[in-house]
């Protein structure tokens, strides 16, 4: 109950324009089963593929940090009309078929009512809970964007300095605490290819036994993957922060969160309290989900998440 209350007060401090028509239970009358339909689709896939939590966390981050949470990432490229989806780091985002299935069922139940942007938000929230993370309410009422341009994509890489990452998050209305929470929480269930952390394999700021293990794995020419959280790889919890404190962060940005004076205290706080992490992670996800949203008459409600209506 306390976490729900905290989230209620969080809504009150978010940008008024974002909250003007976003609210918890937005579809309670227009499509009463909306949230349960999305939850069912996500749960069905989670039973056979627990990695979808990482996929959805990445999908929502990549969507919201490019022109806001408007499902512009979901638009398929066409001949002569490229989109965000196939550009740079977005090329490896996955989970679109789960969004498609949720949309198909929602269109059958409530045609042209539930936005693709809300489906992404709900699916991410539900997958986090399934992976042992916090359960929380999210406001809905987003509309889908009318633009998906690869030139808009400017997402951080795994070697971004902490100071630059702080600036990038600040440009989206997110503070340093939000940044540490979302990066660590998102990476608590993710994987990375060796090519993304080759620079760490000669880094003195990596625990020696982990470094040796990764060097052996990454000697393969097939660019294998490894879990970013070596301790609880499929659970959304605070374990990754403890790993970072023990110099076992895989990506440079992860480890640097524990070394930089502006973020190390936050890492230590989360490492010592999963309760604190769970509360802050729920709050940060809700806050990220309000970045530059379209509401009211702006945008559209897509019939198919992969294409604009016109």
Curated annotation (Swiss-Prot):
The record marks 58 as: Transition state stabilizer. Transmembrane segments: none annotated. It is found in: Secreted. Coiled coil: none annotated. Substrate binds at residue 156. It catalyses: 2 a phenolic donor + H2O2 = 2 a phenolic radical donor + 2 H2O. GO terms for biological process: hydrogen peroxide catabolic process; response to oxidative stress. The keyword S-adenosyl-L-methionine does not apply. GO terms for cellular component: extracellular region. Heme b binds at residue 187. Pfam families: peroxidase. Residues 1-20 form the signal peptide. Its EC number is 1.11.1.7. It comes from the Eukaryota. The active site is at residue 62. Ca(2+) 2 binds at residues 188, 229, 232, 237. Its main location: secreted. SUPFAM superfamilies: Heme-dependent peroxidases. Disulfide bonds join 31-110, 64-69, 116-305, 194-218. PROSITE patterns: PEROXIDASE_2 (PS00436), PEROXIDASE_4 (PS50873). Belongs to the peroxidase family. Classical plant (class III) peroxidase subfamily. PANTHER family: PEROXIDASE, PTHR31517. Removal of H(2)O(2), oxidation of toxic reductants, biosynthesis and degradation of lignin, suberization, auxin catabolism, response to environmental stresses such as wounding, pathogen attack and oxidative stress. These functions might be dependent on each isozyme/isoform in each plant tissue. There are 73 peroxidase genes in A.thaliana. This is Peroxidase 44. It comes from Arabidopsis thaliana.
């Amino acid at each position: 109950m306390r976490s729900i209350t905290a989230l209620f007060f969080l809504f009150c401090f978010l940008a008024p324009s974002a909250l003007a028509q976003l609210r918890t239970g937005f579809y309670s009358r227009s499509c009463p089963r909306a949230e349960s339909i999305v939850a069912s689709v996500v749960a069905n896939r989670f039973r056979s593929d627990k990695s979808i939590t990482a996929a959805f966390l990445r999908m929502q981050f990549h969507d919201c940090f490019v022109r806001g949470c408007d499902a512009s990432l979901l638009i398929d490229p066409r001949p002569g009309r490229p989109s965000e989806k196939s550009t740079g780091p977005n090329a490896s985002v996955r989970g679109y078929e789960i969004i498609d299935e949720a949309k198909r069922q929602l269109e059958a139940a409530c045609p042209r009512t539930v936005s693709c942007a809300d489906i992404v938000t709900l699916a991410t929230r539900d997958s986090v809970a399934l992976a042992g993370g916090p359960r929380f309410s999210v406001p809905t009422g987003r509309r889908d964007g009318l633009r998906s341009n690869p030139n808009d994509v400017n997402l951080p890489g795994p070697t971004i300095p902490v100071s630059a990452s702080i600036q990038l998050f600040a440009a989206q209305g997110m503070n340093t605490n939000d940044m540490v929470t979302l990066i660590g929480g998102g990476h608590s269930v993710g994987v990375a290819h060796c090519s993304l952390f080759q620079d760490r394999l000669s880094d003195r700021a990596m625990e020696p036994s982990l470094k040796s293990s990764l060097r052996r794995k990454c000697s393969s020419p097939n660019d294998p993957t490894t879990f970013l959280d070596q301790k609880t790889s499929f659970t959304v919890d605070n374990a990754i922060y403890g790993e970072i404190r023990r110099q076992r962060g895989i990506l440079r940005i992860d480890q640097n969160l524990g070394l930089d004076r502006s973020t190390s205290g936050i890492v230590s706080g989360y490492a010592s309290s999963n309760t604190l992490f769970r509360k802050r992670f729920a709050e940060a996800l809700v806050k990220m989900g309000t970045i530059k949203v379209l509401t009211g008459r702006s945008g559209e409600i897509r019939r198919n998440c992969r294409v604009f209506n016109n």
